[in-house]
Amino acid sequence: MAGLFVVFEGIDGSGKSTQASRVAHQRGGLFVFEPGDTPMGVDLRHWILEAVTTPMTPATEALLLLADRSHHVHSVIEPALSSGRHVIGDRFYASTLAYQGYGRGVDLGELRAATLLAIGDCRPDLTILIDLSPEVANDRRARDQGDRIESANLEFHDRVRQGYLELARTEADWFVVDGAGSMPEVAADIDERLAQLPW
């Protein structure tokens, strides 16, 4: 029997990485993240996030992320799921729709078509959105310059947040958690929803 694929989404500073890692540890699942979870992905991550002085169009940024995701799906995620292992992801395709689509203005129809090419039939069984205002998320993050995406202004991150909320309203198998609560409160809400899955 194939494993479950659960993905955590949210703006930077929402706490999604902490919760994804926690759930993977508690459930004995494979923790995966994007971008940069493979040797190829490490190189792509450098260009996507860390090469902040390199001019890059939103479409180029999206295509690099999709290249990383395609390789990640075929080399890590699908083999793990096929072997019966649960996979807990820190970001998946919704991140590209939210950040490069709603945030950067890349055409959503074109992004969806490219996403289909990148991931094929691989879909999460559940996507958990940890919703948090950009102002609070910014206060929670370490006070550094951030990468190419983290360093964008609050208006950009608000567009991303609204994009996520729109995806949660219109797509199947999403669960929205109020990220403004304490870490134990957020964890309890997540665990209550996860208990409904056929682990």
Q: Where do the model's predicted regions map?
A:
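NTP-dependent small-molecule kinase module
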Residues: 24, 135-199
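A glycine- and Lys/Arg-enriched "phosphate-lid" helix/loop adjacent to the NTP-binding pocket
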Residues: 91, 98-162
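Walker A/P-loop
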Residues: 17
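ATP-binding Walker
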Residues: 13-14
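Hydrophobic anchor at the beta1->P-loop junction of P-loop NTPases
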Residues: 8
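ATP-dependent small-molecule kinase phosphotransfer cores
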Residues: 30-119
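Pre-Walker A (Motif I) flank of P-loop NTPase domains
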Residues: 2-5
